[in-house]
Every structure is written in structure tokens, then in C-alpha cells.
Amino acid sequence: MEEKSKSRGWCGWFIAIIVLASVILAVVYTVKLRTKKSGDDDGGGPVPGPPGAIDKKYADALKLALQFFDIQKSGKLENNKIPWRGDSGLKDGSEDNLDLSKGLYDAGDHIKFGFPMAFTATVLSWSILEYGDQMNAVNQLDPAKDSLRWITDYLIKAHPSDNVLYIQVGDPKVDHPCWERPEDMKEKRPLTKIDVDTPGTEVAAETAAAMASASLVFKDSDPTYSATLLKHAKQLFNFADTKRGSYSVNIPEVQKFYNSTGYGDELLWAASWLYHATEDKTYLDYVSNHGKEFASFGNPTWFSWDNKLAGTQVLLSRLLFFKKDLSGSKGLGNYRNTAKAVMCGLLPKSPTSTASRTNGGLIWVSEWNSMQQSVSSAFLASLFSDYMLTSRIHKISCDGKIFKATELRDFAKSQADYMLGKNPLGTSFVVGYGDKYPQFVHHRGASIPADATTGCLDGFKWFNSTKPNPNIAYGALVGGPFFNETFTDSRENPMQNEPTTYNNALLVGLLSSLVTTSSTLQSLK
């Protein structure tokens, strides 16, 4: 749990099929992908092909990254693939006659924090929508969709009426003094909710984004479920917008863990996803009309569970790359210009390159969970690069200096490679990947033998053990190194050695973007 004082796949939304050398047929809400228009950076290059050769390194890491979601599942487990996990949290929600047994434990503890869990679902949806063909090429699409549905099943139950959303199961004050397996929990699991008297705009809007994006994922395979998700998304967005108020102001207890710095970004993010899911121009007008109020145009930001602006700007850029009819939405250009500024900040040789970078090349912003910005930045860079290439735009200008779209992809790969072991420490930060990775991950279930029965306190003998975790939390992306590229592998070091589901969702998106090659990128080398 975070304490805060602390495509190159061309499937998903757009499956590019080369029929003639100069013709692209793509499925983007039944509209053809557009080619270069006057004023674009540069165009006329080769067009993308279907997934190509598989990069085993990223394919292996992707399989592991998705496995971490199985490790984090609450509820009655179905087709359980993790031998040291079992059913848990079966009575969650019962005090209000709800079934909140599903969902994911947020990190190494056993709280279900709705705000970052919804963000996890939104990012997983985005990853599937853009890179579903990549995932499918390495047999990981079904596991990704299964994990997403485990979350959205929970979110549906957590929204029992239009203006009520349960946003947390468990109390950190009760949970955190314990060290035990989730299967053995006997402590009370109190519920926290938002409603008209206690609004929480950011968590309601993020949950709306999660449900709207997931409705697209399941639109073809389960249209009834998709329609249910979309109905909830619309209700939650209306609740978020009409009953504005910060959840971390109205519920001060959350401030120590997932404190929000504002809700404007979530409103824009949710409206953007609802437009993609519905093509209802009302939502497009919303992001256009509220851009000056909430979007911080011209000021690049870091994409995270707390700040969705950079993600929103990239997502809305997608419309300008591919959508034909966007009449009356003049404000979208500001979103794409700011997205470009974000990209220019990430390119190492750009005149506006960020200084928030280690000597080894890792994007580094904060000591706590340092890799969140690394993986989120790399994911957005992959997306933007792929949007450019699919649109036959292969250059971007950063203060007059020209960079290729493939250089954004190279940046994304550099971050992924660092996480997988190409770094000064020679260690992988993805548990189970490579020959050297963290052995003492701050994770209760991983640290306690599956056949041990512990209470709240006696489990600390496993926390204090000098032996490595008896269970391997396969696929977990831990917090990451300090700026000086030091890392302490210890259970007592959650700042660096605790994994989170939202980091793993971003990692899944990043690895899915890199898992195969295509004719386009090969031809641009």
C-alpha cells in the first residue's frame, strides 16, 4: 500500500491490415484511420502491419506481470493458479448486505482501496484495447481480461445505487499492525463509502473511467456485461460532476495512504473514456469546455493513480490522430500539444528533457515507489509512438529539434529493460524474472508459508525472518531504486520493496506494446 506524505500492437481499437501498399483499412469505431493532414509533423511513411516476431524477453515478463494479479485476488478463487493462495475476504461487504468479496488487494497488505483499484482497471482496459492482439500473440489476452473482470465485478457491486459508491474495504489502522495471510484474516473489515452527503469526485470519476473503458473491452464478447458497465459509468460520472467534492477532504482518514491532489484530472479522464465508449459528443464537449479549468495546458505532468492529466492528453491525442469528424472540438489541439510536451520531456536528447533521471537512464521522481513514474512514462511513450506510426506521422518536434517516433519507442524500451535487469545493480525489479530479483518482498502472503496458521501478531516471526520469502510473488514490480541507484531488498523497506497492482497494470501495458515486432518498425530502423 502506498503511503503518501508520502500500440506496437495494432489491434484492440484499430487492427491495421495492409490490403494495398497505400491503403489502410482499420477498425476505429467503424471509421478509417486518417492519414496526414496539413499541419501535422510529418507523414507519408510505411503503415503498420499485424504483430510480427515475438520478443521472448518481453513475452516472458508479460506472463509474469499478469500473474501478479492472480496473487492479489480477494474472494472465492476460480481456477486458482497460485498454490499458496486461497479464498479470502468472503464476507467483505456483508455488514451492508453487499458482496464485495472480489477485487484486488492493493499491495502487500489486505486493504481494498477503491481509488487505485479503479485506476488499475482503467489502465488494464487501455492496455487490452490497444495491445490485445499483442497479448493474444503470446496467449496472455484471456488472463488480462479475466483479471480486469475480477475488478469490474467488484466495482459493479460497490456501486449499489446512482449516488453511492463503496470506496474501501478494511481499515488501515486495524489491518496494518497485523502480519498474516489474507486467508487467515479475522479482523473487522469496515466499509467506507461516498454519497451525496460525503462526495468524492475523484474516486467516483476514476471508477466511471474504469467502467467506461472496460465496457469497450467486453463490448463484443459480452455485450450485456458491457452495457451494464457503461450504465454504471454514466451514473458515476454524473454523480462525480454534479456532487463535487474531494474524497480526501471529506474523508480525511484516506490522506495518509491515497491522498488526492485534486479531482479535475479525473473528471477529464472519465469524460474522455465515456466519449470513446459512447461517441456521445456531450463528453467531448465536456473536455473541450473544461480544459482551461482543469487541464493545465502547456505544463507536462507525471501520469499516476493521483494525476491523470498526461494520460488524458495522450488519450485525446488519439482522437486527433484517427478520428474523422471532430467538428466543434477545437480545444483538443491543446491536449495534443501538451501530450507532445510530455513526450519531449521524456526523450533523453530533447532540449526540454526532464532532469528527473538517474545516471542509468531511469525516470525517477520520488523515493516512495519510484518506478511508478518510470513505467507510466514508458507506457505513454509507447502509445504516442504507435499512434504516430499508425497515422504515418513519424517525427515530432521538440523546440525545433526533430525526433523520430521510434526514438520514443526506444525510450520506452530503455525503461522496460532497466526494470528487467539492465541497470547498474544488475538486478531485475520484476520478481521472478531473470537470475537476480528481490527475495524479501514486502508482501504478507509471499512471506508466510502456505501451511502456516497465524493470527494478527504472531505472523511477525515471518516478517522478521532472515530467510527469503517462502512464496515467490511472481511478476510483482517492486517500488524501485533510489536516485543514486541503490536498493535494499528487505521486508522492512516498503518504500522500495513493496509491489502495487497499479504499477503492474502499467507494466502490462508497456510490455504488451513491446512484445512483438511489426513491418513498420522494422522498416524504420
From Swiss-Prot:
<keyword id="KW-0624">Polysaccharide degradation</keyword>
<feature type="glycosylation site" description="N-linked (GlcNAc...) asparagine">
    <location>
        <position position="464"/>
    </location>
</feature>
<dbReference type="GO" id="GO:0008810">
    <property type="term" value="F:cellulase activity"/>
</dbReference>
<feature type="active site">
    <location>
        <position position="442"/>
    </location>
</feature>
<feature type="signal peptide">
    <location>
        <begin position="1"/>
        <end position="26"/>
    </location>
</feature>
<keyword id="KW-0326">Glycosidase</keyword>
<protein>
    <recommendedName>
        <fullName>Endoglucanase 10</fullName>
        <ecNumber>3.2.1.4</ecNumber>
    </recommendedName>
</protein>
<keyword id="KW-0961">Cell wall biogenesis/degradation</keyword>
<dbReference type="InterPro" id="IPR018221">
    <property type="entry name" value="Glyco_hydro_9_His_AS"/>
</dbReference>
<dbReference type="Pfam" id="PF00759">
    <property type="entry name" value="Glyco_hydro_9"/>
</dbReference>
<feature type="active site" description="Nucleophile">
    <location>
        <position position="109"/>
    </location>
</feature>
<keyword id="KW-0964">Secreted</keyword>
<feature type="active site">
    <location>
        <position position="489"/>
    </location>
</feature>
<feature type="active site">
    <location>
        <position position="498"/>
    </location>
</feature>
<keyword id="KW-0732">Signal</keyword>
<dbReference type="GO" id="GO:0005576">
    <property type="term" value="C:extracellular region"/>
</dbReference>
<keyword id="KW-0325">Glycoprotein</keyword>
<dbReference type="InterPro" id="IPR012341">
    <property type="entry name" value="6hp_glycosidase-like_sf"/>
</dbReference>
<keyword id="KW-0136">Cellulose degradation</keyword>
<keyword id="KW-0119">Carbohydrate metabolism</keyword>
<dbReference type="GO" id="GO:0071555">
    <property type="term" value="P:cell wall organization"/>
</dbReference>
<dbReference type="GO" id="GO:0005739">
    <property type="term" value="C:mitochondrion"/>
</dbReference>
<dbReference type="InterPro" id="IPR001701">
    <property type="entry name" value="Glyco_hydro_9"/>
</dbReference>
<dbReference type="GO" id="GO:0005886">
    <property type="term" value="C:plasma membrane"/>
</dbReference>
<comment type="similarity">
    <text>Belongs to the glycosyl hydrolase 9 (cellulase E) family.</text>
</comment>
<dbReference type="GO" id="GO:0030245">
    <property type="term" value="P:cellulose catabolic process"/>
</dbReference>
<feature type="glycosylation site" description="N-linked (GlcNAc...) asparagine">
    <location>
        <position position="484"/>
    </location>
</feature>
<keyword id="KW-0378">Hydrolase</keyword>
<feature type="glycosylation site" description="N-linked (GlcNAc...) asparagine">
    <location>
        <position position="259"/>
    </location>
</feature>
<dbReference type="InterPro" id="IPR008928">
    <property type="entry name" value="6-hairpin_glycosidase_sf"/>
</dbReference>
